[in-house]
Amino acid sequence: MDSLQKQDLRRPKIHGAVQASPYQPPTLASLQRLLWVRQAATLNHIDEVWPSLFLGDAYAARDKSKLIQLGITHVVNAAAGKFQVDTGAKFYRGMSLEYYGIEADDNPFFDLSVYFLPVARYIRAALSVPQGRVLVHCAMGVSRSATLVLAFLMICENMTLVEAIQTVQAHRNICPNSGFLRQLQVLDNRLGRETGRF
């Protein structure tokens, strides 16, 4: 990851005078335990998990009136394609929103990590627009789309993987598959080395 470009995406994190213990990258088992602790009280089709950033399912993505009501300006479909959630630019024709589609499988062997930086850039740019509001979705809104939102928070908001999971889980229950969790672990380790967290 090009550090100059990555730095353009990050917001500075303010640290207090007290030095915390060094960050310990989480194991896969500890991440899965963290995800099993359900924090969100209800199951919704769409939830705001970060200011102006929404995580949702296929139903939410197809509910044009709800998207208009929420003021969604950008949609990231992590389950694009004819045999998945087949929305797209044509589906949203006549609406003032931008569309970004990724043909990703919810499969532990699918490499979603190649999309981490491009999607983070897209979300950051969309949120930088006045009144920019982004929906990231897949079929169920718990694995593919959640993984991309977690990566965004790690890359652009300088969160650890654990912090990102806790942030999202406070608003929506998520469950990235084990392969996606491993890819997020790799990102967490790489960002940790680059930022000196450990």
Curated annotation (Swiss-Prot):
It comes from Homo sapiens (Human). Keywords: Hydrolase, Protein phosphatase. Pfam families: DSPc. Its EC number is 3.1.3.16, 3.1.3.48. One of its GO terms (cellular component) is cytoplasm. Belongs to the protein-tyrosine phosphatase family. Non-receptor class dual specificity subfamily. Gene3D superfamilies: Protein tyrosine phosphatase superfamily. GO terms for biological process: dephosphorylation; meiotic cell cycle; negative regulation of MAPK cascade; protein dephosphorylation; spermatogenesis. This is Dual specificity protein phosphatase 13B.
